Amino acid sequence: MAAAANTSAVFASPSQPLSSKRSFLYSSRIGPILRRFPRKKLDLQVKAVATTLAPLEEIKEYKLPSWAMFEMGTAPVYWKTMNGLPPTSGEKLKLFYNPAASKLTLNEDYGVAFNGGFNQPIMCGGEPRAMLKKDRGKADSPIYTMQICIPKHAVNLIFSFTNGVDWDGPYRLQFQVPKRWQNKPIEFFNEGLANELSQDGACERAIFPDSNVVPTRCTMIANLTVEGGDRCNLDLVPGCMDTNSEHFNPYANVDDGSCPLELSDSDE
């Protein structure tokens, strides 16, 4: 189901359309969008990319379907926010994609990649990013997810999906902006967005798959030291692990020193 089938108002900022002068404010960060694709398919890729850069006035806003419609494959895109409210600038968003609802053929070698940008249909960071695949058993086709940390100056997200050759999209997701900014011109948002995304690693923090996020530090318990972000998902239960102690905690998996020391006769 292509994005063109969705109905809504045409692209607009809080008050003005996006000007061509401002539309490439952070394009200096755009890398070679096709470098992950096989060279033998390069011609196909160039043709496919061109279809994602439709004029902004043709990109209709995508309305949130019901989860049942998405799950059954009658709607290609679904999303949910951390607070249950509509997508809002400065908040977090999880995007779901069901290829069964589109004409995009799954490519087992490549998977599905996300291509999207804020306030314009150009990928933040340069190239499509692989989405996390979630298998649903033999009866249902897999779905794919992507995490979005919406910049404070983003008014919308324009995005497409690719299997490495073909594309589905573009779609446009509109964001709510703070009340104090609702009458600001689009130049205000684009300049602020350019400043936000010019920081090192900003694009990687804004759009990322679940599988690529590895914590760099862990919550410490008492004086324990946990090395490596790959161990942060452990359920640490501190307690006495001495089975001979009256303070033994059978659920503990980290000794926190709570077992009382037994002094020998020589120490007394």
Swiss-Prot record:
Query: Where does the protein end up?
Result: Plastid, Chloroplast stroma
Keywords (alphabetical) are: Chloroplast, Plastid, Stress response, Transit peptide
Q: Does the keyword Transit peptide apply?
A: yes
Q: Name one Pfam family in it.
A: Ig_PIFI
The knockout outcome noted for this protein's gene is: Normal growth and photosynthesis in normal conditions. Intact NDH complex, but altered NDH-dependent chlorophyll fluorescence increase after turning off actinic light and lower capacity for nonphotochemical quenching in high light intensities, due to altered nonphotochemical reduction of the plastoquinone (PQ). Increased sensitivity to photoinhibition and long-term mild heat stress.
Record GO biological process: cellular heat acclimation; chlororespiration; nonphotochemical quenching
Range annotated as the organelle transit peptide: 1-49
GO annotations of cellular component type? chloroplast; chloroplast stroma; cytosol; thylakoid
The protein's job, in short, is: Required during nonphotochemical quenching. Involved in NAD(P)H dehydrogenase complex-mediated chlororespiratory electron transport which mediates electron flow from stromal reductants to the plastoquinone (PQ) pool during chlorophyll fluorescence increase after turning off actinic light, in response to photoinhibition conditions (e.g. high light intensities), and upon long-term mild heat stress.
Query: What name does the UniProt record give this protein?
Result: Protein POST-ILLUMINATION CHLOROPHYLL FLUORESCENCE INCREASE, chloroplastic
Which source organism? Arabidopsis thaliana
Which lineage ranks, top first, belong to the organism behind this chain? Eukaryota, Viridiplantae, Streptophyta, Embryophyta, Tracheophyta
